[in-house]
Amino acid sequence: MALRCLLVDDNDAFLEAARVLLEREGMRVAGVASNIAGALRQARALRPDVILVDIGLGEESGFELARLLAADGQGGQRVRADVVLISAQAETDYTDLIAESPAAGFLPKSELSAQRISQILNRQLRAGQPGFQLAGSGAGRLPGRPGHSYARS
């Protein structure tokens, strides 16, 4: 089964380019959003495996969205997706904020690929982060998604 993702970015051209790239690589883009309110609605409705969140969402912050998604998942169990922060800026510009965020990791937009997303999620799994469980094959499995692996088949 393909990894399902939600893309969150305030740049329509990037959203379309990312959708084409990720779908060509076997990932299923379940939806897109351009702001926090839209992202929360889409995340609850679509229940994606991973949410790619641009750090700069116009007047809003991707860090704030990551915190809201983490709180929503813990409280209401409505959103159980990993967040990967993305940006055109270098990771070093946000090192402390990324470390303090509940996101699974950071990915520069220039390195966006299904393989890199899987690497981030698998690295989190190997680190023993909560919310994940090991399946018999040793591949990462998402709770509530039987038979789903982070690795592309």
Report the location of each language-model feature.
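Active-site residues of response regulator receiver
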Residues: D9, D54, S87
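Two-component/phosphorelay signaling modules centered on CheY-like receiver
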Residues: D12-G31
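Acidic, metal-coordinating helix/loop segments flanking the phosphotransfer/catalytic sites
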Residues: V32-V50
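As written
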Residues: G62, I98-G105
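Short amphipathic alpha-helix used as the core "switch/output" element in two-component signaling
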Residues: F63-R78
